């Protein structure tokens, strides 16, 4: 089961472009254009190709990033496997790193190559070193893309297919923090636009938390979608965020809000201290020393550091993140002294992040998401007990039904899983996991027509499901439809060069 990314943003249908805002707010607009948030996506133009060739030692695959007539591209090679892909868009400001996207008939996937700014080198993208071949089909979901691009253009009913272009405005637009701008542009009244600094603390902080608070797991509220949250809302009305009880885990790419909440400064200052206390959202970072001396003037005078030193050098050190190589981020926990990250025990409890729901339904879904991770299958019994109760309390909750069905199927109880999958799909036909899982049971029971119907539907939602495509080819093979079997195997080989299963089956079919 693929991890579900649960972030929520303004839908493109309500968008006014940032250029329209510039007509009245030129000075702010010009400053903002030079911030990292303004350049978190776009078309690659000035990439550093000085160290653009590398070999992945564990697999022996050699990668090279280069420019051709169409733009940026990369190739991979380990005889006899080789291939290349265009890289039409980048993701990430480049302040620490930059990832790239590949496209196949409008379906977007994260490329296995990335650029790391501090090291000034190209290497595999985060988590790609676990694969024995170039992995080209990690889906780029709207919930992920929306933290880097604006005015998205997703195709309804799919998970990762987009129109052309996939987003109308690169980077984080004005509306991402200020909400819909059409009424404000028409009236020029302050009441018709969101100013985060003037919101109540929980709504103000939600504007930043939508992208900078992941916790250990996020659980979507019933009926919520990636576009549910609007600036001015409480993020907690759309999702629940859970963290590990009593733990101070290492820094991750999106742990800024969580780490700040762990700091003595935040715990003492409360709502007075927030992201905007130190960060100018329209420009570069404010003077840290001035901010710190506002509370620490007396103690700072007795500090061993020199009078004009930057407080953050010691108290907000740059540290390696735990979920990406070659990347360092600022430690927002503001430690008095540098400390080693705590090791989170396998059985540590999940607790709601302050201000977010800890309802039994949300907790059940959170444990189910954790237990679906390959390294956390030992949490299945706990997740199962919570899901069973949640299923009784919420019999029409498609998310609960799907995760419950997944545990039953993965523990050898398909008869219990089938009605749950079917009910979930009746409630929400877009449920990809249910479509794939129910098709798997049909295949195991040699109900090939049912498996074919479900898996064709799954591939319409996400064309990059190579295992599903390979098994679909086998289902067609079983009913004697060799043309469709070959068609899907050819596509599987093209989408996953180096993956032995479809290549072997295709060779066998063509003998």
How should each PLM-predicted stretch be described?
Residues 410, 444-445, 478-479, 508-511:
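Register position in tetratricopeptide repeats
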